[in-house]
Protein backbone atom coordinates (compact mmCIF):
# COMPACT_ATOMS: atom_id res chain seq x y z
CA UNK A 1 0.00 0.00 0.00
CA UNK A 2 1.32 3.44 -0.90
CA UNK A 3 2.46 5.50 2.05
CA UNK A 4 2.07 9.24 2.54
CA UNK A 5 5.69 10.42 2.23
CA UNK A 6 5.15 13.25 4.74
CA UNK A 7 3.50 11.02 7.37
CA UNK A 8 4.89 7.52 6.90
CA UNK A 9 1.57 5.69 7.32
CA UNK A 10 -0.83 4.11 4.87
CA UNK A 11 -3.60 6.60 4.00
CA UNK A 12 -6.40 4.41 5.35
CA UNK A 13 -4.52 3.79 8.60
CA UNK A 14 -3.98 7.52 9.09
CA UNK A 15 -7.67 8.13 8.36
CA UNK A 16 -8.65 5.46 10.89
CA UNK A 17 -6.46 7.01 13.59
CA UNK A 18 -7.90 10.49 13.04
CA UNK A 19 -11.57 9.53 12.68
CA UNK A 20 -11.82 6.98 15.50
CA UNK A 21 -9.96 9.35 17.84
CA UNK A 22 -12.31 12.20 16.89
CA UNK A 23 -15.55 10.29 17.55
CA UNK A 24 -14.55 8.65 20.85
CA UNK A 25 -14.24 11.79 23.07
CA UNK A 26 -17.05 13.73 21.38
CA UNK A 27 -19.21 13.87 24.53
CA UNK A 28 -16.34 15.36 26.53
CA UNK A 29 -15.44 17.78 23.72
CA UNK A 30 -19.03 19.07 23.62
CA UNK A 31 -19.48 19.06 27.40
CA UNK A 32 -20.99 22.59 27.73
CA UNK A 33 -23.88 21.80 25.38
CA UNK A 34 -24.37 18.27 26.73
CA UNK A 35 -24.34 19.43 30.37
CA UNK A 36 -27.03 22.01 29.62
CA UNK A 37 -29.21 19.35 28.00
CA UNK A 38 -28.71 16.97 30.94
CA UNK A 39 -30.09 19.69 33.21
CA UNK A 40 -33.01 20.61 30.94
CA UNK A 41 -34.12 17.14 29.84
CA UNK A 42 -33.24 14.94 32.81
CA UNK A 43 -33.47 17.57 35.54
CA UNK A 44 -30.00 16.75 36.86
CA UNK A 45 -28.14 19.05 39.21
CA UNK A 46 -24.48 20.07 38.89
CA UNK A 47 -23.24 17.22 41.11
CA UNK A 48 -24.90 14.46 39.09
CA UNK A 49 -23.93 16.05 35.78
CA UNK A 50 -20.34 16.20 37.00
CA UNK A 51 -20.51 12.54 38.00
CA UNK A 52 -21.62 11.52 34.50
CA UNK A 53 -18.68 13.30 32.89
CA UNK A 54 -16.27 12.00 35.54
CA UNK A 55 -17.42 8.43 34.91
CA UNK A 56 -16.83 8.82 31.16
CA UNK A 57 -13.36 10.28 31.69
CA UNK A 58 -12.41 7.64 34.27
CA UNK A 59 -13.66 4.72 32.17
CA UNK A 60 -11.87 6.00 29.08
CA UNK A 61 -8.62 6.25 31.04
CA UNK A 62 -9.04 2.90 32.82
CA UNK A 63 -9.34 1.16 29.45
CA UNK A 64 -5.55 1.31 29.64
CA UNK A 65 -5.47 -1.45 32.28
CA UNK A 66 -6.95 -4.32 30.22
CA UNK A 67 -4.94 -3.03 27.27
CA UNK A 68 -1.75 -4.04 29.09
CA UNK A 69 -2.94 -7.62 28.60
CA UNK A 70 -4.41 -7.61 25.10
CA UNK A 71 -1.98 -5.22 23.43
CA UNK A 72 0.78 -7.83 23.10
CA UNK A 73 -1.52 -10.82 22.58
CA UNK A 74 -4.52 -9.88 20.44
CA UNK A 75 -4.89 -8.56 16.93
CA UNK A 76 -5.48 -4.80 17.23
CA UNK A 77 -7.86 -4.89 14.27
CA UNK A 78 -10.15 -7.35 16.05
CA UNK A 79 -9.95 -5.30 19.24
CA UNK A 80 -10.93 -2.18 17.30
CA UNK A 81 -13.90 -3.94 15.68
CA UNK A 82 -15.13 -5.33 18.99
CA UNK A 83 -14.70 -2.01 20.80
CA UNK A 84 -16.47 -0.13 18.00
CA UNK A 85 -19.44 -2.52 18.13
CA UNK A 86 -19.62 -2.14 21.92
CA UNK A 87 -19.47 1.65 21.54
CA UNK A 88 -22.33 1.54 19.03
CA UNK A 89 -24.46 -0.68 21.25
CA UNK A 90 -23.88 1.40 24.39
CA UNK A 91 -24.82 4.62 22.60
CA UNK A 92 -27.93 3.10 21.04
CA UNK A 93 -29.01 1.96 24.50
CA UNK A 94 -28.17 5.39 25.98
CA UNK A 95 -30.51 7.04 23.49
CA UNK A 96 -33.47 5.21 25.03
CA UNK A 97 -32.43 5.34 28.70
CA UNK A 98 -34.05 7.83 31.06
CA UNK A 99 -32.87 6.32 34.36
CA UNK A 100 -29.81 8.00 35.86
CA UNK A 101 -28.08 4.86 37.16
CA UNK A 102 -28.70 2.99 33.92
CA UNK A 103 -27.45 5.92 31.87
CA UNK A 104 -24.30 6.17 34.00
CA UNK A 105 -23.56 2.46 33.49
CA UNK A 106 -24.08 2.77 29.74
CA UNK A 107 -21.87 5.86 29.54
CA UNK A 108 -19.14 3.98 31.42
CA UNK A 109 -19.46 1.06 28.99
CA UNK A 110 -19.31 3.40 25.99
CA UNK A 111 -16.25 5.17 27.41
CA UNK A 112 -14.50 1.87 28.17
CA UNK A 113 -14.98 0.83 24.55
CA UNK A 114 -13.90 4.27 23.37
CA UNK A 115 -10.82 4.18 25.58
CA UNK A 116 -9.79 0.87 24.02
CA UNK A 117 -10.15 2.45 20.57
CA UNK A 118 -8.09 5.41 21.74
CA UNK A 119 -5.33 3.07 22.91
CA UNK A 120 -5.25 1.49 19.44
CA UNK A 121 -5.15 4.94 17.81
CA UNK A 122 -2.38 6.32 20.04
CA UNK A 123 -0.27 3.17 19.71
CA UNK A 124 -0.78 3.05 15.93
CA UNK A 125 0.29 6.68 15.61
CA UNK A 126 3.48 5.84 17.49
CA UNK A 127 4.47 3.49 14.66
CA UNK A 128 4.86 6.42 12.27
CA UNK A 129 8.40 7.73 11.69
CA UNK A 130 6.86 11.21 11.91
CA UNK A 131 4.60 10.73 14.92
CA UNK A 132 4.51 14.46 15.68
CA UNK A 133 2.58 15.07 12.46
CA UNK A 134 0.20 12.19 13.11
CA UNK A 135 -0.52 13.44 16.63
CA UNK A 136 -1.13 16.90 15.19
CA UNK A 137 -3.88 15.45 13.01
CA UNK A 138 -5.07 13.33 15.95
CA UNK A 139 -5.64 16.50 18.01
CA UNK A 140 -7.10 18.43 15.06
CA UNK A 141 -9.77 15.80 14.40
CA UNK A 142 -10.98 15.93 17.99
CA UNK A 143 -11.11 19.73 18.05
CA UNK A 144 -12.86 20.04 14.69
CA UNK A 145 -15.57 17.50 15.54
CA UNK A 146 -15.96 19.10 18.98
CA UNK A 147 -16.42 22.55 17.42
CA UNK A 148 -18.95 21.19 14.92
CA UNK A 149 -20.78 19.45 17.76
CA UNK A 150 -21.04 22.62 19.83
CA UNK A 151 -22.51 24.34 16.78
CA UNK A 152 -25.06 21.72 15.66
CA UNK A 153 -26.09 20.05 18.94
CA UNK A 154 -28.14 22.89 20.54
CA UNK A 155 -30.73 23.04 17.70
CA UNK A 156 -30.77 19.23 17.48
CA UNK A 157 -31.33 19.00 21.23
CA UNK A 158 -34.25 21.41 20.93
CA UNK A 159 -35.99 19.05 18.49
CA UNK A 160 -34.81 15.57 19.43
CA UNK A 161 -33.26 15.75 22.90
CA UNK A 162 -30.29 13.65 23.97
CA UNK A 163 -31.19 11.01 21.37
CA UNK A 164 -29.62 13.30 18.78
CA UNK A 165 -26.25 12.98 20.53
CA UNK A 166 -26.23 9.26 21.20
CA UNK A 167 -27.75 8.18 17.89
CA UNK A 168 -25.35 10.53 16.12
CA UNK A 169 -22.36 8.96 17.89
CA UNK A 170 -23.58 5.48 16.99
CA UNK A 171 -24.02 6.51 13.35
CA UNK A 172 -20.56 8.07 13.17
CA UNK A 173 -19.00 4.93 14.62
CA UNK A 174 -20.89 2.76 12.11
CA UNK A 175 -19.36 4.87 9.34
CA UNK A 176 -15.89 4.45 10.87
CA UNK A 177 -16.24 0.69 11.46
CA UNK A 178 -14.91 -0.43 8.04
CA UNK A 179 -11.67 1.42 8.80
CA UNK A 180 -10.92 -0.89 11.75
CA UNK A 181 -9.21 -3.25 9.33
CA UNK A 182 -6.71 -0.53 8.42
CA UNK A 183 -4.95 -0.75 11.79
CA UNK A 184 -1.90 -2.97 12.11
CA UNK A 185 -2.17 -6.33 13.81
CA UNK A 186 0.01 -4.94 16.60
CA UNK A 187 2.67 -6.83 18.49
CA UNK A 188 0.83 -10.09 17.92
CA UNK A 189 2.24 -10.11 14.42
CA UNK A 190 5.71 -9.01 15.45
CA UNK A 191 6.60 -11.42 18.22
CA UNK A 192 10.03 -12.04 16.71
CA UNK A 193 10.93 -8.42 17.50
CA UNK A 194 10.12 -8.76 21.17
CA UNK A 195 12.71 -7.48 23.61
CA UNK A 196 13.70 -8.38 27.12
CA UNK A 197 12.04 -6.75 30.14
CA UNK A 198 13.36 -3.28 30.96
CA UNK A 199 15.78 -2.90 33.81
CA UNK A 200 17.91 -0.24 35.40
CA UNK A 201 18.26 3.16 33.79
CA UNK A 202 16.14 2.11 30.82
CA UNK A 203 12.99 3.14 32.66
CA UNK A 204 14.13 6.74 33.19
CA UNK A 205 13.20 8.25 29.80
CA UNK A 206 9.76 6.64 29.80
CA UNK A 207 8.98 7.61 33.38
CA UNK A 208 10.11 11.19 32.80
CA UNK A 209 8.01 11.34 29.63
CA UNK A 210 4.90 10.08 31.43
CA UNK A 211 5.52 12.51 34.29
CA UNK A 212 5.78 15.34 31.76
CA UNK A 213 2.41 14.39 30.24
CA UNK A 214 0.83 14.18 33.72
CA UNK A 215 1.96 17.61 34.93
CA UNK A 216 1.31 19.18 31.52
CA UNK A 217 -2.34 18.10 31.58
CA UNK A 218 -2.71 18.91 35.28
CA UNK A 219 -1.40 22.43 34.71
CA UNK A 220 -3.48 23.20 31.64
CA UNK A 221 -6.71 21.68 33.03
CA UNK A 222 -6.40 23.69 36.25
CA UNK A 223 -6.20 26.90 34.22
CA UNK A 224 -8.79 26.07 31.56
CA UNK A 225 -11.38 24.76 34.03
CA UNK A 226 -11.34 27.97 36.06
CA UNK A 227 -10.44 30.52 33.40
CA UNK A 228 -14.00 31.80 33.68
CA UNK A 229 -13.23 32.73 37.29
CA UNK A 230 -10.37 34.91 36.07
CA UNK A 231 -12.80 36.75 33.80
CA UNK A 232 -15.38 37.12 36.58
CA UNK A 233 -12.80 38.43 39.07
CA UNK A 234 -11.68 40.94 36.45
CA UNK A 235 -15.26 42.21 35.91
CA UNK A 236 -15.29 40.93 32.32
CA UNK A 237 -18.82 40.31 31.07
CA UNK A 238 -19.75 36.62 30.64
CA UNK A 239 -20.85 37.27 27.05
CA UNK A 240 -17.44 38.77 26.24
CA UNK A 241 -15.48 35.96 27.87
CA UNK A 242 -17.71 33.38 26.16
CA UNK A 243 -16.97 34.84 22.73
CA UNK A 244 -13.25 34.89 23.48
CA UNK A 245 -13.24 31.25 24.55
CA UNK A 246 -15.21 30.28 21.43
CA UNK A 247 -12.60 31.95 19.24
CA UNK A 248 -9.93 30.17 21.27
CA UNK A 249 -11.31 26.84 20.01
CA UNK A 250 -10.48 27.94 16.46
CA UNK A 251 -6.98 28.91 17.59
CA UNK A 252 -6.65 25.43 19.08
CA UNK A 253 -7.39 23.87 15.70
CA UNK A 254 -4.85 26.19 14.10
CA UNK A 255 -2.22 25.22 16.68
CA UNK A 256 -2.51 21.49 16.03
CA UNK A 257 -2.48 22.00 12.26
CA UNK A 258 0.67 24.12 12.56
CA UNK A 259 2.31 21.27 14.47
CA UNK A 260 1.35 18.91 11.65
CA UNK A 261 2.81 21.20 9.00
CA UNK A 262 6.06 21.75 10.89
CA UNK A 263 6.57 18.13 11.94
CA UNK A 264 10.28 17.26 12.12
CA UNK A 265 11.44 20.26 10.09
CA UNK A 266 12.47 22.26 13.17
CA UNK A 267 14.48 20.99 16.16
CA UNK A 268 12.01 19.44 18.58
CA UNK A 269 13.68 20.81 21.71
CA UNK A 270 13.17 24.34 20.43
CA UNK A 271 9.53 23.63 19.58
CA UNK A 272 8.94 22.22 23.06
CA UNK A 273 10.61 25.23 24.64
CA UNK A 274 8.68 27.65 22.44
CA UNK A 275 5.29 26.04 23.06
CA UNK A 276 5.63 25.53 26.80
CA UNK A 277 7.34 28.89 27.25
CA UNK A 278 4.52 30.77 25.52
CA UNK A 279 1.92 28.79 27.50
CA UNK A 280 3.66 29.89 30.70
CA UNK A 281 3.71 33.48 29.45
CA UNK A 282 -0.03 33.26 28.74
CA UNK A 283 -0.66 32.10 32.30
CA UNK A 284 1.35 35.03 33.63
CA UNK A 285 -0.80 37.40 31.57
CA UNK A 286 -3.84 36.14 33.49
CA UNK A 287 -2.40 37.29 36.83
CA UNK A 288 -3.64 40.37 38.70
CA UNK A 289 -7.08 41.04 37.19
CA UNK A 290 -6.29 41.36 33.47
CA UNK A 291 -8.12 43.81 31.24
CA UNK A 292 -10.40 42.49 28.50
CA UNK A 293 -7.64 42.86 25.91
CA UNK A 294 -5.04 41.12 28.07
CA UNK A 295 -7.48 38.34 28.98
CA UNK A 296 -8.29 37.78 25.30
CA UNK A 297 -4.63 37.66 24.31
CA UNK A 298 -3.78 35.26 27.14
CA UNK A 299 -6.69 32.90 26.43
CA UNK A 300 -6.01 32.77 22.69
CA UNK A 301 -2.27 32.29 23.15
CA UNK A 302 -2.81 29.60 25.79
CA UNK A 303 -5.17 27.55 23.63
CA UNK A 304 -3.01 27.87 20.51
CA UNK A 305 0.17 26.79 22.30
CA UNK A 306 -1.59 23.99 24.18
CA UNK A 307 -2.57 22.18 20.98
CA UNK A 308 0.62 23.20 19.19
CA UNK A 309 3.01 21.66 21.71
CA UNK A 310 0.96 18.54 22.59
CA UNK A 311 1.82 16.58 19.40
CA UNK A 312 5.53 17.14 20.03
CA UNK A 313 5.18 15.99 23.65
CA UNK A 314 3.47 12.77 22.57
CA UNK A 315 6.03 12.28 19.81
CA UNK A 316 8.77 12.27 22.47
CA UNK A 317 7.09 9.24 24.03
CA UNK A 318 6.52 7.63 20.64
CA UNK A 319 10.26 7.88 19.93
CA UNK A 320 10.85 5.62 22.92
CA UNK A 321 8.21 3.02 22.09
CA UNK A 322 7.14 2.01 18.59
CA UNK A 323 5.16 -0.97 19.94
CA UNK A 324 2.65 1.20 21.83
CA UNK A 325 3.08 -0.04 25.41
CA UNK A 326 4.34 3.31 26.69
CA UNK A 327 1.68 5.14 24.66
CA UNK A 328 -0.92 2.91 26.31
CA UNK A 329 0.26 4.27 29.66
CA UNK A 330 0.03 7.78 28.25
CA UNK A 331 -3.72 7.27 27.75
CA UNK A 332 -4.07 6.61 31.49
CA UNK A 333 -1.82 9.51 32.45
CA UNK A 334 -3.73 11.97 30.24
CA UNK A 335 -6.97 11.15 32.04
CA UNK A 336 -5.23 11.39 35.39
CA UNK A 337 -3.80 14.79 34.58
CA UNK A 338 -7.15 16.12 33.36
CA UNK A 339 -8.74 15.03 36.65
CA UNK A 340 -5.84 16.07 38.89
CA UNK A 341 -5.70 19.72 37.81
CA UNK A 342 -9.26 20.72 38.80
CA UNK A 343 -9.13 18.40 41.84
CA UNK A 344 -6.22 20.43 43.23
CA UNK A 345 -7.25 23.86 41.95
CA UNK A 346 -10.80 23.67 43.36
CA UNK A 347 -9.79 23.23 47.02
CA UNK A 348 -7.03 25.82 46.58
CA UNK A 349 -9.65 28.36 45.50
CA UNK A 350 -11.96 27.41 48.36
CA UNK A 351 -9.24 27.81 50.99
CA UNK A 352 -8.85 31.46 50.04
CA UNK A 353 -5.44 31.19 48.41
CA UNK A 354 -7.06 32.56 45.27
CA UNK A 355 -6.63 32.22 41.54
CA UNK A 356 -3.13 33.66 41.72
CA UNK A 357 -1.91 30.53 43.54
CA UNK A 358 -3.61 28.29 40.97
CA UNK A 359 -2.01 30.16 38.08
CA UNK A 360 1.46 30.14 39.64
CA UNK A 361 1.12 26.42 40.40
CA UNK A 362 0.05 25.73 36.82
CA UNK A 363 3.01 27.68 35.45
CA UNK A 364 5.31 25.59 37.65
CA UNK A 365 3.68 22.42 36.26
CA UNK A 366 4.56 23.50 32.72
CA UNK A 367 8.15 24.22 33.73
CA UNK A 368 8.34 20.77 35.36
CA UNK A 369 6.97 19.24 32.16
CA UNK A 370 9.66 20.94 30.09
CA UNK A 371 12.40 19.79 32.48
CA UNK A 372 11.14 16.20 32.40
CA UNK A 373 10.96 16.26 28.59
CA UNK A 374 14.53 17.50 28.36
CA UNK A 375 15.63 14.61 30.59
CA UNK A 376 13.69 12.23 28.35
CA UNK A 377 15.35 13.64 25.24
CA UNK A 378 18.80 13.56 26.81
CA UNK A 379 18.42 9.97 28.00
CA UNK A 380 17.10 8.72 24.68
CA UNK A 381 20.48 7.24 23.77
CA UNK A 382 20.04 4.76 26.64
CA UNK A 383 17.23 2.95 24.84
CA UNK A 384 16.90 0.95 21.66
CA UNK A 385 13.26 -0.17 21.63
CA UNK A 386 10.54 1.28 23.88
CA UNK A 387 12.04 1.98 27.28
CA UNK A 388 14.49 -0.90 27.18
CA UNK A 389 18.25 -0.39 27.51
What are these regions (language model features)?
Residues 128, 137-185:
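Helix-loop-helix hairpin linking two adjacent transmembrane segments in secondary transporters
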Residues 32, 205-246, 250-253:
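Extracytoplasmic gate region of multi-pass secondary transporters
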Residues 108-141:
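Cytoplasmic helix-loop-helix junction between adjacent transmembrane helices
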Residues 62-98:
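Conserved MFS/SLC helix-loop-helix module at the cytosolic interface between two early adjacent transmembrane helices
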Residues 43, 96-101, 267, 288-290:
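Helix-breaking motifs and short loop linkers at transmembrane-helix boundaries and internal kinks
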Residues 267-313:
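C-terminal transmembrane helical hairpin of 12-TM major facilitator-type secondary transporters
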Residues 63-76, 255-268, 349-350:
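Helix-to-loop junctions at the C-terminal end of transmembrane segments
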Residues 322-354, 362:
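A late C-terminal transmembrane helix in Major Facilitator Superfamily
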Amino acid sequence: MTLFPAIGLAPLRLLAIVLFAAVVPCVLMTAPAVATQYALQLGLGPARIGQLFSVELAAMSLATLPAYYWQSRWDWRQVARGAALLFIGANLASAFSDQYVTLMALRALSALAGGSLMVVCIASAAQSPQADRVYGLWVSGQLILGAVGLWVLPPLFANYGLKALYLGLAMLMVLCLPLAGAFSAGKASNGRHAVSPPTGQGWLPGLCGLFAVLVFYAGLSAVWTFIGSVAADSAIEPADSGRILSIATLLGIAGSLCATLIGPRWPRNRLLGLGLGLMTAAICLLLDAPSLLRFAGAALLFKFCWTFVLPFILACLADLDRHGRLMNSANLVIGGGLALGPAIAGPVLETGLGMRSVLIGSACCLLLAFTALMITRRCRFLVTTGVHP
